[in-house]
Amino acid sequence: MLDTVDFESRLREIIAAHLAMEGPLLPILHAVQHEWGHVPEPAIPVIAEALNLGRAEVHGVVSFY
């Protein structure tokens, strides 16, 4: 089980480290998967909001790969 505070803090660090990249979604998802071994469901809305994308769009990329 993920500790919510630590999880969200670490997730936001990962997102911030990739925001300046062109097309940061895949690098963020790869980093998240590297950190936790998968992309946790609670990460999807946080990533979507940070990138100004819809949750469905992020979920679609996660489920495709």
What is the predicted function of each stretch?
Residues 1-65:
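Signature of N-terminal electron-transfer/Fe-S-associated modules in redox systems
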